[in-house]
Design a protein with these regions (language model features):
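Active-site bordering "gate/hinge" segments
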Residues: 1-255
Length: 257
């Protein structure tokens, strides 16, 4: 288990955060000082001032995954056998399949969030993740197909998910689709409508507007590492980019239809 304290402050309508894994009073007080100082500095460039009475309300509640059987009922061999069946069926589907990978991940996460504003939220989540990926190659062309991309096949469930999962059928389908991609004609060079599957749509939004809206990139702090951004500070609240159906806001209380 991991422990820590996150200090959340608001100064002049500006939020700031700082955290420490050390629970000694000295480190907690240092966190407060740093968070307050950062909020004061950031408030000079604030694009939106929050109202203290409208945010960080003291909610209470509990949640746990609805499951039939705990994940602890599964042994290491159960997981190993499942991964082996997945990769074996993908590799054996066609001689043009040159690579197959199966990832099985089980997560038991217990989180309790207690805040000085009265919040007390207890969450117990059991998560099952199964990733299948198959790569087909013919001469100089190769194509990869997966079951909805990285972490695209992720569920809140118990051991019953693994016990009922027909990985053999899905593995063969993944390799079949990889072969279909390999045999498909090249896309024509023309202007046309593009339909994105959910995994590609998430990645498209993530790369095209997600990273550019990161303040460290906008301010130039990441220029020598991950890159900069085409967004400027003066663009906040005015820049229109992309479809009207897509909107990204920091205020999660706003409702968009």
């Amino acid at each position: 288990a991991t422990k820590g304290v996150m200090i959340d402050v608001m100064v002049n309508g500006q939020f700031s955060y700082y955290a420490t894994p050390f629970l000694d009073e000295k480190y907690i007080l240092d966190c407060i000082d740093i968070a307050v100082n950062n909020a004061q500095l950031a408030s000079k460039f604030s694009v939106f001032k929050f109202d203290h009475d409208e945010v960080r309300k003291g909610y209470e509640g509990s949640y746990k995954t609805n499951l039939k059987s705990p994940l602890s009922n599964l042994s290491v061999n159960d997981i190993k056998d499942l991964a082996f069946i997945g990769s074996k069926n993908m590799m054996n589907f066609d001689k043009r399949i040159i690579h197959a990978a199966t990832t099985v991940e089980l997560i038991e996460r217990n989180t309790r969030i207690v805040s000085t504003n009265g919040a007390d939220i207890d969450q117990k989540m059991d998560i099952v993740l199964v990733e299948l990926s198959s790569t087909a190659q013919d001469k100089n062309d190769s194509q990869t197909r997966s079951n909805h991309g990285m972490r695209g096949h992720c569920f809140q469930a118990g051991a019953e998910f693994i016990e009922d999962y027909d990985i053999e059928t899905e593995a063969k389908q993944i390799s079949h689709q990889a072969i279909e991609l390999l045999e498909a004609d090249q896309c024509p060079t023309e202007v046309c409508d593009l339909v994105l599957a959910p995994d590609q749509m998430m990645l498209q939004i993530h790369e095209s507007v997600g990273h550019p809206l990161e303040l460290d990139r906008i301010l130039g702090d990441e220029r020598n590492f991950a890159g900069s951004s085409f967004v400027n500070l003066e663009d906040f609240g005015t820049l229109k980019y992309g479809s009207e159906l897509m909107n990204i806001v920091f205020d999660l209380s706003l409702i968009h239809i």
